[in-house]
Amino acid sequence: MLEVSIIPFEEKYAKQFYNLNVEWLEKYFYVEPYDQKVLSSPKTYIIDKGGFIFFATYNNEIVGTVALINQQQFYELSKMAVSPKYHGLKIGQKLIDYCIQFGKEKKWDSITLYSNRKLVPAINLYKKVGFVGSTPILGSAVP
């Protein structure tokens, strides 16, 4: 069985970041103008502002992504998407686990995320890895 690897952002992966996120947004919500801007220029809107983007690879293919966005007072786990044909391989959990470990290594106090209550499988995953609910956000201390 092939392993899932987590790799950092490189400009050559910007299109996959866009495609994975747009696919997810179109399935559950819609792509807002601000989303379009951020997803089209992730280096400008995330990396250059002190954030991080990671990708999950499986069988030498980019199959998932996640961003840690610098919100000045905290880091926000955001823009997480996994290609539907790779659901069930726990790639989302691997991306989140990687981000939590990354935050620990950086000695961050916490990572925050925002989610929609209708995304029940995602909410369950967030709780499973230690995020705690509040209204309207889920947040987690980095243990």
PLM regions and their residue ranges:
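Acetyl-CoA-dependent GNAT
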Residues: V4, P8-K79, S83-K85, I96-Y98, ...
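Conserved GNAT acetyl-CoA-binding A-motif
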Residues: G103-S115
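Conserved catalytic-core motifs of GNAT/GCN5-like acyltransferases
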Residues: T112-R117, I123, K127-P143
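Conserved glycine-rich acetyl-CoA-binding loop
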Residues: E61, M80-D97, K106, R117-N124, ...
